A protein has these predicted regions:
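Juxtamembrane intracellular "pre-TM" segments in multi-pass secondary transporters
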Residues: 2-7, 197-237
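Helix-loop boundary and gating motifs at the non-cytosolic
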Residues: 3-56, 235-240, 244-264
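Loop-to-transmembrane helix entry
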Residues: 40-54, 264-285, 333, 367, ...
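Glycine-rich segments within core transmembrane alpha-helices of 12-TM secondary carriers
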Residues: 56, 135-159, 373-384
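Helix-to-loop junctions at the C-terminal end of transmembrane segments
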Residues: 57-71, 289-304, 391-392
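C-terminal ends and interior cores of transmembrane alpha-helices
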Residues: 77, 81-97, 311-329
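C-terminal membrane-cytosol helix-exit motif in multi-pass small-molecule transporters
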Residues: 180-202, 413-418
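C-terminal transmembrane helical hairpin of 12-TM major facilitator-type secondary transporters
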Residues: 303-352
């Protein structure tokens, strides 16, 4: 068995970060298309698919417990097995209309995925030397992004292809069973090839052996929270993290329902397979935008880059106004519009990440960055909860005009932040 300290990172890093991405995108993206196709109204769909992302908001609360209870490797394998079982049950329950039970298992998948994130990132730092960590940072990022393409494009294309030969419910059952089987194979693979790190006890707790573990954990959590909320400019930073992605938070919940809705209902009347193809193009351009945005920000500096990148994130949302008003039939016109929007999203999201890295600088950089991402998730979750209820009385065209109006606070808070940098 290759389960030892000297296993090459190539044997487990690609699959580890692919496994980190798949359940995340299943919960945050694929669930929207699933419930839309199964007939859930937009208001309920947006509300419930937002609520099931709550584990990523509160993830920092239990992160210290993962550091001290058992090992990171144990947590990784346990969470992968739990996600495998949860998705397996989803495959049978959701397509049959057991929505409440399905939402419970989506929430379990989300909790397991959030915990897996903590354990995987911690294991990465324990199992690799500093030199190896630097060498593989691009690899882990690449395979996480491949998981994005897999879920938002390839899975939807598979669902659409299956729907040509079977029912909507059966197509989702077969697809989710395939995802469960893939997660099972990855879990087995990691049980064989993930190395056993020599020491996985939290350094903080090693230095204080006289203090009970539980007391040490809560002291560490409390100190981290207090110092975070005492940071200079915390009020402005929180406003930025909550408002910067406001237009995107609304769009995320209604994009796919808009694509799938019939034209007489204000949508584009696309098949699931076509939506997957369009997002295949869009996600690639989003990744390109992220690369270009990072390079440009490093060249001109965050202060000069932030406002233009915020405009790149928000203003391309206008393509949805155009699509809802014109309702074009051309695959290439629709793909070009989504490609522009996704390219802008990639550029704009980079600015958000760079600002959070900048704000988190200090004694507890990693923990404070985790809190920043939690606040950012809250900024996505809360608007997403009401997105469907905004769309239902207004229709898609009216809803997209509301999204454009929401660009104003996003750009305004970015302007204020830029002046303070």
């Amino acid at each position: 068995m290759a389960s030892n300290r000297h296993t090459s990172p190539w044997w487990w890093i690609p699959t580890l970060y692919f496994a980190e991405g798949v359940p995340y995108f299943l919960v945050t993206s694929v669930s929207i298309t699933l419930f839309t196709q199964l007939g859930m109204p937009n208001g309920q769909m947006a509300l419930f698919t937002s609520l099931i992302t709550f584990p990523w908001v509160i993830k920092p609360l239990w992160s210290p417990f993962v550091d001290v209870i058992r090992t990171k490797r144990w947590w990784v394998l346990l969470m992968q097995a739990l996600m495998c079982i949860s998705v397996f049950l989803l495959a049978w329950l959701a397509p049959q209309g057991y929505f409440t039970t399905a939402l419970i298992f989506f929430t379990i998948t989300a909790f397991a995925s959030a915990t897996h994130d903590i354990a995987a990132d911690g294991f990465y730092m324990l199992a690799l030397s500093d030199k190896q960590q630097s060498a593989f940072v691009g690899i882990r990022s690449t395979f996480y992004k491949i998981a994005n393409i897999f879920c938002q494009s390839l899975l939807l294309m598979l669902v659409g292809w299956l729907q040509k030969h079977t029912s909507v419910a059966a197509s989702w059952t077969y697809t989710l069973l395939g995802c469960s089987g893939l997660l099972a194979l990855i879990t087995l693979w990691h049980s064989l090839f993930m190395p056993r790190a020599e020491s996985e006890l939290s350094p903080t707790l090693k230095t204080d052996t006289q203090t009970p573990i539980r007391q040490s954990i809560w002291h560490e959590v409390g100190t981290t929270f207090v110092e975070f909320f005492r940071k200079s400019g915390i009020g402005l930073a929180l406003c930025f993290m909550l408002l910067y992605r406001l237009p995107e938070a609304l769009l995320l919940k209604l994009c796919n329902p808009f694509f799938l809705a019939a034209k007489d209902a204000g949508g584009l009347g696309l098949s699931v397979e076509t939506v997957g193809q369009i997002y295949g193009i869009g996600v690639v351009l989003m990744l390109l935008g992220g690369i270009v945005g990072g390079l440009w920000a490093s060249r001109v500096g965050l202060r000069k880059a932030m406002l233009p990148m915020a405009l790149c994130l928000t203003l391309p949302s206008f393509v949805y106004v155009y699509l809802a008003a014109v309702q074009p039939d051309s695959f290439w016109v629709i793909s070009a519009c989504i490609g522009i929007e996704q390219l802008g999203y990639g550029l704009g999201y980079t600015a958000c990440m760079l600002y959070m890295i900048h704000f988190a600088e200090g004694a507890h950089k990693t923990a404070h960055f985790s809190l920043c991402t939690a606040v950012m998730f809250l900024g996505l979750m809360l608007p997403g909860m009401v997105a469907g209820y905004i769309e239902e009385p207004l229709g898609y065209l009216g809803f997209f005009w509301v999204v454009m109006a929401c660009c104003i606070p996003s750009i305004a808070i970015t302007y204020v932040v830029c002046r303070k940098l």
